[in-house]
Structures are given as C-alpha cells and as structure tokens.
A protein has these predicted regions:
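Basic, low-complexity intrinsically disordered segments
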Residues: 1-268
C-alpha cells in the first residue's frame, strides 16, 4: 500500500514477487536489455531453470519476438526440443548464445510443433489440408521453422522428362543461402519418400539453383518414422536430406524436461 501510494499502481503482491525474481535472475541491472518490455521479463521469469531462461532471453532479443511469440515458443517447449538434439556442451551453448544457424542440421526440430494449423489430431485429414493450413498460417509456421526462412511457393512444379512432379512447400534460407524443400506426409514416413525427395533435390541443384547458391536441403515431415528404416534409406545419399516428425498439438513439457534432465545427468 505504501509503494502504491508513493509510486502509483502496479505494486500488488504478484508483481512484487516477480520484481524480486527479476532482481535475483538479473542482479546487475546493466545486463537487462531495453529491447524487452516488463511483459517479456514477466514471461521469462516463469522458466524453471536458468539455462532455459537465458535461451529465451537471448532469442527474444535476437529474433525481436513479441510477447505472444515468446509465450508460444515457451509453450511449444522450443528450448527442450532443440536441446534434445545435441549434447551437454550444445545445451550450454544454446543457453548462452541462443540458437545459431550455421549448418543444415541446425534448422531441424524433431518434432516440429504445428498446433496453430487447427487440425484436430484425431480427425482424418489429407496432406493437402495440412499444406493449406500451413500456408494460411504462414507467419506462425515461419516462427516455428526459425530465423532465415523466406516462403517461395506451394506445390512447386517440376517437369522431369515426360513426367511432372510437385513438392509441397519451397522456401529459401537467407542465412544458409539455399533452397529448402518440404514434403508433408499425413502418416508414417516410408523409405520411398526418401527417394522421391532425393529426386527433387537433384532437380533443384541442376535446374533451379544459381551458381552462388549452396546445395538445397530436403525435409520430409511425417507423424511417425522408423529410425532404423530411415537410417538404411538415407545411407549413401549425398544430398542434405532430413526426416522429422511433426505433431498437431503442444508437447507435454514434463516429458521433454525429463528427457533433457536425463541427457544432462548422463553427461556428468
């Protein structure tokens, strides 16, 4: 009451609790970024550990996330999903430097979370339904894909010999300087899907890419994948070709955090 009387509104019990948390997390006020608002810090302080908070802090500044974008990335467990694809040193680098995009592998998340598409996970849908939903929610899809992506087209047509083929989504990655082709599968990824994407990549290298472009990247997205089958299917392929899962709902944070804790404990 005394603080409110002297300084105005905003000094309720909840805000005071978060102000204390802010001081404990950032004891040196000079380390705080003026690019972030109090609402950003309010969300950051909900993180369970310092590594996670540092990651979202760095990414919010680097990517100029609005508060709603920060909240979505936290709900989708972006930190845990990226961290589980690396080792302990990678987790620490992720927290200290944010997500660095330097190689094709850096743009892969497994799973990709597409809850914004609005397709009920139990309802049957066609691949074209998912493709259209992603195009209709392109801003959210680009947020999930990460920095550097520029949308090129949907159902990109390729004439190869006497046959015509179409790849679902095509992007250009401004950091990696290459095309990124995405093929969507409604169910489990099959070994034939790998050969099909490899065909598309070979076509792009020859017919589409410019001399100063890096080799294209292919991503086959499905709801499930057999790890051993994919290992054999990808063996011997020299193109940058990846397979990853997607899900139409937000992940369970507790499960991902438990997996990450196990990874860090095993590295001790």
């Amino acid at each position: 009451k005394d603080l409110t009387a002297r300084n105005g509104k905003g000094f309720n019990r909840t805000n005071l609790t978060y102000m204390r948390k802010l001081y404990l997390a950032f004891p040196k006020c000079g380390t705080l970024s003026h690019k972030l608002t109090w609402s950003h810090y309010y969300e950051l302080l909900k993180c369970d550990n310092a590594l996670e908070m540092q990651f979202y802090y760095k990414e919010s500044i680097k990517e100029c996330w609005k508060v709603r974008e920060l909240k979505r990335q936290m709900k989708s467990c972006l930190f845990q999903r990226l961290a589980l694809s690396t080792d302990k040193a990678g987790v620490l680098a992720l927290a200290n430097e944010g997500h660095q995009v330097q190689t094709p592998q850096d743009i892969i998340r497994d799973p990709f979370v597409l809850e914004f598409a609005g397709l009920p996970k139990q309802k049957r849908y066609k691949e074209s339904d998912l493709e259209k939903a992603l195009k209709d929610h392109m801003e959210q899809f680009l947020l999930e894909m990460g920095r550097g992506f520029a949308f090129v087209g949907r159902q990109y047509s390729m004439q190869i010999g006497s046959r015509q083929f179409k790849v679902d989504l095509v992007f250009y990655h401004c950091i990696l300087k290459c095309y990124v082709l995405i093929d969507l599968k409604r169910a489990e990824i099959k070994h034939g899907d790998i050969g099909q994407m490899n065909l598309y990549l070979n076509y792009f290298k020859t017919e589409v890419c410019q001399p100063d472009d890096n080799p294209p990247i292919g991503i086959v997205l499905g709801t499930r994948k057999d790890e051993l089958l994919m290992e054999y299917a990808l063996e011997g392929i020299t193109n940058q070709l990846f397979v990853a899962r997607y899900q139409l709902y937000l992940p369970k944070r507790e499960e991902l955090q438990a997996q990450l804790d196990k990874l860090l404990d095993e590295a001790e």
